[in-house]
Amino acid sequence: MSLFNLKNKSILITGSSKGIGKAIAYQCAEHGAKVIISSRKLDICEQTAVEINTKLDSEVAYAIPANISDDDQLENLVNETRKKIGKIDVLICNAATNPFMGSMLDMPIEKFDKVMHNNIRSNQILCNLVLPEMISNEDGSIIIISSIAAIKGSPILGAYNISKA
């Protein structure tokens, strides 16, 4: 048995249409999981899902767009994931935002609130939406992607540093 056998696992990954999230989705699918590709733009999500499905010659990746700043879209993401792949065994919160670079002294409070909402609050909402099923099944995993910013501060990424700690 392989340490990385994800056969029959269903994984919801936010921020998975490109970058690290896309790589996570591909690796999970390659190891047998069904994956949900999610980010704000449907066309990019679909493109990533097609790319993964083509590389693996199997329909294992599905696109469901969601903006992590919108609570209703988060709820819809979880509901549509369940409709598409039946269950959620693993939630990977990868999506994040940083709309401001500069000194915290110059950061408008609206930008600070956006970072905290998108990088912390949205993860809490998603966890609350999937945890009851995981508790009921006595199985499941939640992974929240951090960043080097959590341990190495930056004078121009203050709020982002806080949100990743």
For each predicted feature, which ranges?
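Conserved glycine-rich cofactor-binding loop
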Residues: 10, 15-19
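Substrate-binding pocket helix/loop in short-chain dehydrogenase/reductase
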Residues: 102-104, 108-116
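Active-site helix of classical SDR
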Residues: 127, 163
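The beta1-alpha1 cofactor-binding region of Rossmann-like NAD(H)/NADP(H)-dependent oxidoreductases
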Residues: 42, 65-76, 109
